[in-house]
């Protein structure tokens, strides 16, 4: 019945010329925000979507998908999403917890017996970036392995003996190593590779047919090419073996697939509501102070209401997604150049849409 009422409302809105004018004005304002950052029509660009109640109300693309071939971006191009991958990793861990195969309170030595101080670091610490372990992306020796094929165990061995930055639970410090560990634990517990687990239990289940574990070798239709900007102009992105970022940043997706992802989270298609909510709450440090990160999402506020946010950055690509639960507003943006960031653009769009729709009420 609720869906029928929404469809009737949308139909009436479509018939009302005043609402069409309202939508056009909103679109013009959104365009202006994006064009202020994405200025080069002949360079790499970005794609953006705004959805309300699960339905797109704005979709537009800017710039080139491939500069050399002069191919324009369209809304259905596939982008590397970088650290937005962490959302999928966190939900996968919660799925395993719901199945009784692990708990977020488990210490990691239960799964990796030789991990230094593994009896003090929990899965919860990894999920919330409070483990204190060394972030491998900050290690100078990363360049030595960046283009090598690494197994999850090899990745863990790469950073596990580094001196820790702080005791588990003492502070929040964004950490990619923690999410690599989560992917490794997922494989040990499930008996599946991370790639296969996400593909089978999430992407296929939700019909996210344009999303996958990233690869530079496979031919992928509608793939956006990544770029970097130097003083001399644009160059192709730095090559990285995706086994290195692994479960911390190796997925590819589209605007429409990410909307399916958000819709599935809203409808609890992957987890029971009480388990899903674990990802979207703030947690406390050892001193009792709350910090603004759940499991795979930053939990912040925008104009006095809660927002769930996460971005991503990997060679040649940037991404950003913002969800406002109280208004069911989802804004997502992708860029195929590290010279154009969708982060502030997406936040500004979300704020504009929130303010506009709130006033319209």
What are the functions of these language-model segments?
Residues 218-230:
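Mobile, glycine-enriched helix-loop/loop "lid" segments at the mouths of ligand-binding/catalytic clefts
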Residues 140-220, 243-259:
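Catalytic-site signature segments of enzymes, centered on catalytic residues
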Residues 64-176, 192, 228-235, 239:
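Active-site-proximal loop and beta-strand segments within enzyme catalytic domains
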Residues 24-61, 146, 187-190, 196-200, ...:
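Catalytic loop of the DD-peptidase/beta-lactamase superfamily, centered on the K-T-G motif
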Residues 57, 116-122, 132-138, 195, ...:
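Secretory-pathway/luminal and periplasmic proteins that interact with or process carbohydrate-rich
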């Amino acid at each position: 019945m609720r869906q029928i009422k929404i469809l009737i409302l949308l139909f009436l809105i479509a018939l009302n010329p005043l609402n069409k004018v309202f939508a056009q004005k909103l679109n013009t304002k959104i365009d202006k925000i994006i064009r202020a950052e994405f200025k080069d029509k002949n360079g790499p660009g970005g794609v953006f979507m705004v959805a309300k109640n699960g339905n797109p109300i704005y979709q537009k693309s800017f710039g080139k998908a491939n500069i050399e071939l002069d191919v324009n971006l369209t809304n259905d191009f596939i982008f590397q999403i970088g650290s937005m991958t962490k959302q999928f990793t966190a939900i996968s861990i919660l799925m395993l917890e719901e199945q009784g195969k692990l708990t977020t309170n488990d210490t990691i030595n239960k799964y990796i017996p030789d991990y230094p101080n593994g009896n003090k670091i929990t899965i919860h610490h990894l999920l919330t970036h409070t483990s204190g372990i060394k972030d491998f992306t900050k290690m100078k020796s990363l360049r030595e392995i960046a283009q090598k094929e690494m197994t999850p165990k090899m990745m863990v061995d790469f950073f596990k003996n580094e001196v820790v930055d702080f005791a588990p639970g003492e502070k929040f410090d964004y950490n990619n190593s923690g999410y690599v560990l989560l992917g490794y634990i997922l494989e040990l517990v499930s008996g599946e590779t991370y790639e296969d687990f996400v593909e089978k239990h999430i992407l296929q289940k939700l019909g996210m047919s344009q999303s996958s574990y990233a690869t530079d070798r496979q031919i992928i239709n509608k793939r956006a090419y990544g770029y970097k900007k130097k003083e001399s102009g644009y160059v192709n992105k730095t090559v990285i073996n995706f086994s290195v970022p692994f479960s911390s940043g190796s997925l590819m997706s589209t605007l429409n697939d990410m909307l399916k992802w958000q819709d599935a989270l809203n409808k609890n298609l992957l987890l029971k509501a009480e388990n899903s909510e674990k990802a979207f709450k703030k947690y406390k440090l050892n001193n009792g102070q709350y910090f603004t990160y759940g499991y795979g999402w930053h939990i912040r506020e925008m104009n006095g209401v809660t927002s769930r946010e996460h971005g991503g950055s990997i060679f040649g690509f940037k991404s950003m997604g913002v969800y406002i639960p109280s208004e069911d507003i989802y804004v997502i943006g992708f860029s195929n150049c590290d010279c154009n960031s969708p982060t502030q653009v997406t936040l500004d769009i979300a704020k504009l849409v929130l303010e506009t729709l709130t006033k319209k009420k």
